[in-house]
């Protein structure tokens, strides 16, 4: 049994006492006006002091978080180094930067379209946020659903800010993405007749969440990684891209690489480049914990920005409502939304529900922050404060064995610390989860401002608008990974690479100097900084 405090145990008894009553009395959904109010008053995206305006680059004048601004306007790692661009160490038709779900999908598809592909990844293939995804992947492939309904759910959930051409691509290609994954060997949950089981997510009007228990991302990544390796695609691991190389015509034409183990600098020349570097959770914006993997440090945004790529919605992040608040050993780890879709309710220290559990993620997160901070109704934890996620309700609704069958990974994670989520509620608080914004692309997955630079996955801005619905990120890495891979392979057939240059890096440095910026922070950051500053 986990060593809960006396205060936590007393609060837990109140949760148990109200459970039966709450089972038949769902908390009402918010009106549009109530949602706007709770967001503006409580969501981290609305804390003006956390932001600054960029002074140089394609997005000069736009606001971004301080941590990201320091990297976008940071010091290039290639300055002062002699780099031989005339004798590249690697040459390919398509260079894929990143080894997660988007990068793997892109590499597989580019290879299938006849391109010579090289994948570089600063960690290992599969060390990515894809592995951390739990709940599932959306696709409107049931008789009562359609891509049009999926579009409306996602467009509204993203505050009507998504780029229509990108969102349309996401929802219309979703059913084929599920089929592609299934054909590759992904083992989705099915009923006894072989039909895929689907569930709701926050903000969905239909059950369209396809899952692999509660380790959907790991199962998808396992399958994609195997396909990359089975195809014999060259993977250069523990090697980071630290600068995009352009040719004399201003087109993306490769990358400067850094061996993470030896420090060796190398050059990769390519006809097209695909950035699939994922998110930025390990920058710990505003001091938040994160559900992200160790390498999520916004590298792709930095590389693209210095090369002249415009960003879109870089000021907006997703804070997943339910990160672990206790035990401290897994502080910030993801508690999948599927827990709530199966019936678990969010309740305060007195056992009272305070929000409909499947509101959109930003609204739910803001409601939890309000309950804990402004209202003072949270439960004290080792690292701060949290609210209860009443997991025993799942088996009251679905019957004994539901938790072990539907969310076994979640059950095991808490069992490691002596918490049986079938009998005991768990403490949660929002955790930094997803980069809503990213690099601005067109309908062909190419940067709107840099030719031959393609982007897929979490590094893209505009697919989800200003908030993402559950299950649409695992979907976008497949849809846009495949499309970027195909588009890059086709584009490579038309490209003749000019003389390689890094002149854009020197030009960016001059703009920083002219703006009075003396960057001290090396960028891209590559790895999180957890060194103590007070030693």
Please tell me what each predicted stretch does:
Residues 139-170:
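Glycine-rich active-site loop/strand segments that organize a redox cofactor
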């Amino acid at each position: 049994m986990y060593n809960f405090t006396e205060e936590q145990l007393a609060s837990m008894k109140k949760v148990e006492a109200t459970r039966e009553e709450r089972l038949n009395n769902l908390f009402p959904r918010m009106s549009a006006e109530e949602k706007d109010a709770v967001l503006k008053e409580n969501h981290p995206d609305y804390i003006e002091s956390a932001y600054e305006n960029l002074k140089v680059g394609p997005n000069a004048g736009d606001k971004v978080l301080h941590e990201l601004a320091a990297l976008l306007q940071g010091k290039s790692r290639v300055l002062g180094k002699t780099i031989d661009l005339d004798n590249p160490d690697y040459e390919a038709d398509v260079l894929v930067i990143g080894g997660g779900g988007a990068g793997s999908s892109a590499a597989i598809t580019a290879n299938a379209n006849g391109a010579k592909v090289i994948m570089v990844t600063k960690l290992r293939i599969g060390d990515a946020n894809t592995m951390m995804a739990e709940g599932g992947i959306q696709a409107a492939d049931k008789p009562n659903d359609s891509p049009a309904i999926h579009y409306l759910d996602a467009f509204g959930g993203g505050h009507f800010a998504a780029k229509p051409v990108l969102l349309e691509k996401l929802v219309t290609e979703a059913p084929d993405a599920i089929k592609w994954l299934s054909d590759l060997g992904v083992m989705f949950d099915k009923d006894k007749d072989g039909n895929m089981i689907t569930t709701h997510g926050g903000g969905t009007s239909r059950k369209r969440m396809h899952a692999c228990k509660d380790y959907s991302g790991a199962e998808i990544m396992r399958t994609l990684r195997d396909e990359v390796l089975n195809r014999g695609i060259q993977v250069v691991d523990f090697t980071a891209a630290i600068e995009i190389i352009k040719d004399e015509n201003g087109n993306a034409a490769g990358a400067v690489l850094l061996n993470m183990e030896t420090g060796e600098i190398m050059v990769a020349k390519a006809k097209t480049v695909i950035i699939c570097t994922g998110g930025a959770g390990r920058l710990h914006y505003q001091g938040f914990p994160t559900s992200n993997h160790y390498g999520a440090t916004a590298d792709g945004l930095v590389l693209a920005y210095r090369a002249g790529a415009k960003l879109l919605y870089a000021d907006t992040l997703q804070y997943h409502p339910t990160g672990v608040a206790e035990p401290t050993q897994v502080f910030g780890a993801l508690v999948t939304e599927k827990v709530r879709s199966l019936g678990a309710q969010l309740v305060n220290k007195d056992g009272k529900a305070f929000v409909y559990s499947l509101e959109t993620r930003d609204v739910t997160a803001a409601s939890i922050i309000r309950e804990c901070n402004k209202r003072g109704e949270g439960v004290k934890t080792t690292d701060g404060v949290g609210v209860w996620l009443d997991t025993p309700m799942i088996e009251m609704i679905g019957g004994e064995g539901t938790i072990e069958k539907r969310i076994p990974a979640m059950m095991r994670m808490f069992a490691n610390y002596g918490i049986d989520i079938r009998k005991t509620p768990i403490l949660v608080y929002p955790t930094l989860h997803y980069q809503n914004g990213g690099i601005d692309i067109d309908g062909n997955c190419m940067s709107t401002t840099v030719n031959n630079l393609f982007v897929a996955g979490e590094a893209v801005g505009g697919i989800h608008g200003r908030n993402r619905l559950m299950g649409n990120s695992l979907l976008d890495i497949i849809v846009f990974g495949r499309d970027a891979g195909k588009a890059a392979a086709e584009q490579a057939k038309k490209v003749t690479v000019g003389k390689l240059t890094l002149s854009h890096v020197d030009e960016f440095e001059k703009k920083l100097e002219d703006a009075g910026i003396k960057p001290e922070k090396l960028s891209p950051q590559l790895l999180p900084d957890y060194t103590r500053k007070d030693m």
